[in-house]
Amino acid sequence: MSAAAFLNDFHHVATIGATPNNGVDRQAATADDARTRNWFAEWVRRAGWELRVDGIGNMFGLLEWTPGAPFVVIGSHLDSQPLGGRFDGAYGVIAAMHAARSIDLEVAESGMAPRFNLAVVNWFNEEGGRFAPSIMGSSVFAGLLDREKMLAVTDLQGVSVREALDGIGYLGTAEGPELAGYAEIHIEQGRILEREGINIGLVDSSWYTQKLDIEVLGEQSHTGATAMADRHDALVAASKIILMVHDVTKDFAEEALVSSVGQLTLEPNSPIVVARRVHLVADLRSGDPEIVTAARAALLEQIDALAREHDIKVNVKDFDIRPIRRFPKAGLELSAKVAGKLGLSSRRIQTMAGHDSVAMNTVAPSVMLFIPSVDGVSHCEREFTTDDDMVTGLAMLTGVARELVSGALAGQERPTAELATAVAGAAGAMAGGAA
């Protein structure tokens, strides 16, 4: 394993779509995403591996040592948030590429093929910054989302996933590999590892997540000529909903629930017109599904009262509901053993953020690893992780992948999902006015 070669590749990729303050902007299926994909494809070809692109744009570099055997897949994603960080996702893909190359050399030198083959993946649209929902490519691969429905999803400009992928030349037709297991390494995007001085986080579970699609419908009118008493301002109502989403966390123990509104659009978006429509997306997350259920119920009640107060209509729909997923105990034990052999400190940790590994954990034994994030900052240009921590994580991923291709987690059962009782299967809700 060459740390210098890995770091050279990582810092090169960070120049693609680079932003002024050391971040990147490589939203899914944009020109800069295409440039990064081209780099990945060329790297895979130079390594002598098979390149496949499936029907949702996922890219695979396959190393087949044992014909007919399934594949352990390792990787992450190369797309980013708008004005995002250069470490999120890209680190996991590039680390996987170099881990796979090291194992490939070991296999060639030993002349002994392992039980399983190995593949490196760049998942499509993990971030969800351009197309919703996030974690799209891996969820389609895992059968959690319908491919045709996802290809029809459009961005804010009305461009569909199908059109965008076709436009950059990455609407593939190949099938992904048969899966034996999955591993992913990622920056923590939190402060626990840095604060405790721990090298590696062993992810044991994901938080429960759900989003609310909220449409506020008021009445368009003149900002100067319309009397204040006669206004039905959708933006004023939406601003109060944003505060409700923020403040609902105060109803629960500190940090038991996180919530925010991260996207907002309004119509007609003119400086001299009272807004007739505002669309926003609220994000609720907790380690306890029932807390999300309670927060959702409280918000719906408050939104209903607000709609009546302002004499407007508010439509609220549930979407992107993700249950708690627990990672296999055997994978956690395996990872702790690898860390110990490498002389690395480790601890179990939850992931509050969504990752491709959470989707993959529904179809195959999966391992999720974290390395420290400086100040816990992520999804912004200030995101940072040291070179030393990245190289340490590369060694860890290589060790785990080596064990997985040898069959370490073969025969492990898939974990079950933990849904909130009141939200599971919910189709949506309506609030206020004539709704």
Model-assigned labels for residue ranges:
Residues 28-29, 260-269, 281-283, 287-288, ...:
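A short beta-alpha structural unit
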Residues 74, 83-127, 210-216, 222, ...:
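Alpha-helical metal-binding/catalytic segments enriched in His/Glu/Asp
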